[in-house]
Regions:
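Electropositive, gly/pro-rich neighborhoods at or near active sites that engage anionic ligands
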Residues: 2-106
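Short, amphipathic C-terminal "tail helix"
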Residues: 553, 567-599
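Conserved mixed alpha/beta catalytic, RNA-binding, or beta-rich assembly cores of soluble enzyme
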Residues: 62-171, 176
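Short, structured coil segments at secondary-structure junctions
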Residues: 148, 191-194
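Mg2+-dependent prenyl diphosphate-binding active-site environment of isoprenoid biosynthetic enzymes
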Residues: 264-509, 578
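Charge-patterned, long linear interaction tracts outside catalytic cores
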Residues: 235-277
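Mobile late-domain/C-terminal helix-loop "cap" segments
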Residues: 510-564
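Ser/Thr/Gly-rich flexible loops in soluble cytosolic domains mediating phosphotransfer, phosphorylation
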Residues: 196-232
């Protein structure tokens, strides 16, 4: 693990200063006690918003700064900051929400408005199935919204809402929620660039709560001619990236060579397995990066409209190639780690056998190269050659990183330094970001002046992203049917392990090395193993240390983006940092372990 390029070694050592810690918002979530005071804050926000430029996306930091100004002008305390930020966001988007047809809007209602003692409704996969019995406001709001053509969900789950947004079924959200829920959803909705209006609940009790009903009905009824000023959003490009994997579009872009063969033909079956896995699951972030980088260097027309711009099939196929390589690596990784689930379903090798799964991964690699090489006439031979070279380089780095991880896992000596872990991350995770970003830039024109920046930026983003994944591993993952601590059970060389080894006492270090060395031994009690390692990690404060490293790598990536021109490309790089490096809560010392689903 000492033969990695000097650039990666320097990147691990040269880290920008840590940003100031994020504001603790617990003391800023009070709702003004009287309706008169709520109306006063809203009126001040409306007046303030008449002066701001709504073509630029609103961020949490900008919203907080503006809200603090408004509260200061009213002589009110900071306890109303969260409420004021919601009012500001509402006013920012109000005109654009009003211009969107009712049948393209989603009404999102909280279950805590229901009458807890007598509610006859039951829960399904989408939330509370309201019976409209008249015992609470939920039915009234739902009836009104559905009469106008809204899609309605009684749920507070952000993931399902984001899936609906990306799928292209809605263009705006009108919601009701407490300030705690709105805070959690704030960054996701703003980053998605989806017009939204939310009416805050008057308390966060999560039971028999109340709301300003007339404000809710007002937001449901909003309807005006198309807005004169639109805010930039990457939603159109997210949807374009997502749509490439839906049928019949996937088979149109990448025709199935064996489609005419009988269904019983093994060649057709093998092709179907590969296409099914290519289309399955994932956020499609890598092809999105390629499309968005290409668009940014073409003036970013797709960020202002879902019409008037078009991506050629050759550009789409190049973006598809990035995801094809990613999916191939997942198939092979799952075999090497003997993982049970991927995207909430059994892994390919568990369903079809190791041999078939290996071959499907190889098939996807070949398909990825062919997607670019077959379009060299449309792209230009030099463009195709440059992209193929970058894909090959990324493929080799990924294999080096995975190889180093496997050799460490199977070696008797489990010593690991933070530098060792960071070098593996720079090889395993960063190349995918680099290939996606490079391809988009090269499709748009010359890449020469961006090449070093792309490599450095991708390295910092990729390493930070992998550290966040390490942290997330300790909170579990319901979507992929994983319990917390899977990296320990698989004896992976993570940064968290390296930090623990370096920050523990000799006795703790010896115990940790023993635990990792026996993690994959038959008969090991996984729950006991994870519990003991968790305790050692907390003793060494590894989660806090890892979180600070994420901040440092993020700051370095942002400093690289600061120097980039044109503005559209620089703004996309900032957006990429915000979305890829979105943080969750740090693991808690005492949590209830997730139950392994489907076992």
């Amino acid at each position: 693990m000492t033969t990695v390029a000097e650039a990666e070694l320097e990147a691990a050592n040269e880290i920008a200063p840590t940003k100031p810690p994020k504001l603790n918002t617990a003391a800023f979530k009070a709702v003004p006690e009287t309706r008169a005071l709520r109306d006063q804050v809203r009126a001040a926000v409306e007046a303030f918003c008449k002066t701001i430029d709504k073509s630029k996306p609103l961020t949490r930091d900008i919203s907080r700064e503006m809200s603090e100004q408004i509260l200061a002008s009213l002589g009110l305390g900071g306890q109303y900051l969260g409420f004021t930020m919601v009012m500001l966001t509402n006013e920012f988007w109000r005109e654009q929400v009003a211009a969107i047809p009712f049948n393209r809007r989603l009404m999102l209602l909280p279950h805590c408005l229901k009458n807890a003692e007598g509610c006859p409704a039951e829960y399904d996969e989408f939330g509370l199935d309201c019976k409209k019995c008249g015992a609470c406001e939920v039915g009234d709001f739902r009836t009104k919204a559905e009469q106008l053509g809204y899609k309605v969900l009684v749920s507070e789950g952000t993931p399902i809402v984001l899936k609906i947004i990306v799928s292209g079924h809605i263009d705006a959200i009108v919601g009701v929620a407490c300030l705690n829920v709105l805070e959690k959803a704030f960054d996701k909705v703003l980053l998605a660039g989806i017009p939204c209006i939310a009416t805050p609940l008057l308390s966060s009790n999560c039971k028999n709560t109340s709301v300003d009903n007339d404000w809710v009905f007002e937001s449901i009824d909003l309807h005006t001619p198309p807005a004169g000023q639109k805010t930039k959003t990457y939603m159109h490009l997210m949807r374009a990236a997502n749509a490439m994997f839906d049928e019949p579009e996937l088979s149109r872009l990448v025709p199935r060579a064996r489609a005419a063969s009988p269904e019983t033909d093994p060649l057709r079956k093998h092709e179907a397995i590969a296409y099914d896995f290519l289309a399955r699951g994932g956020k499609r972030s890598r092809p999105f990066i390629t499309l968005a980088a290409f668009d940014a260097l073409k003036g970013a027309p797709a960020t202002l409209s879902d019409s008037g711009w078009e991506l050629s099939d050759s550009v789409k196929r190049a973006a598809l190639a990035i995801e094809t390589f990613h999916k191939a690596s997942l198939v092979h990784d799952d075999i090497e780690d003997d993982d049970s689930y991927r995207y909430g379903e059994e892994t390919l090798h568990r369903v079809h056998g190791v041999g078939t799964a290996i071959n499907v991964g190889d098939y996807l690699i070949g398909l990825g190269y062919r997607l670019v090489s077959r379009d060299r006439k449309e792209l230009g031979s030099d463009v195709a050659a440059d992209i193929l070279d970058k894909l090959a380089d990324s493929h080799m780095k990924l294999s080096e990183g995975q190889g180093a991880e496997l050799l460490w896992r199977d070696a008797p000596n489990k010593a690991l330094t933070t530098l060792d872990a960071l070098k593996i991350y720079a090889l395993k995770t960063s190349p995918a970001f680099e290939a996606a970003l490079y391809s988009g830039v090269r499709l748009a024109g010359s890449v020469e002046k961006y090449e070093k920046m792309i490599a450095d930026f991708s390295r910092n983003v990729g390493v930070a992203f992998q550290i966040l994944n390490d942290i997330k591993d300790w909170t579990g993952d319901h979507d992929n049917k994983l319990v917390a601590g899977q990296d320990v059970c698989a004896a992976r060389p993570t940064l968290l392990l390296a930090l623990a080894l370096e920050g523990s006492s000799p006795a703790q270090r010896e115990e940790l090395l023993h635990l990792i060395s026996t993690a994959r031994t038959e008969g090991t009690d996984a729950e006991e193993l994870v519990g003991r390692v968790r305790a050692l990690y907390f003793s060494a404060k590894v989660f806090e240390k890892a979180d600070k490293l994420v901040d440092k790598f993020r700051a370095k990536a942002e400093s690289l983006a600061d120097e980039v021109e044109p503005t559209e490309f620089r703004e996309f790089l900032y957006y990429l940092v915000d979305t890829v490096l979105e943080k969750g809560e740090l693991p808690r010392q005492a949590i209830t372990q997730f139950v392994q689903l489907g076992m």
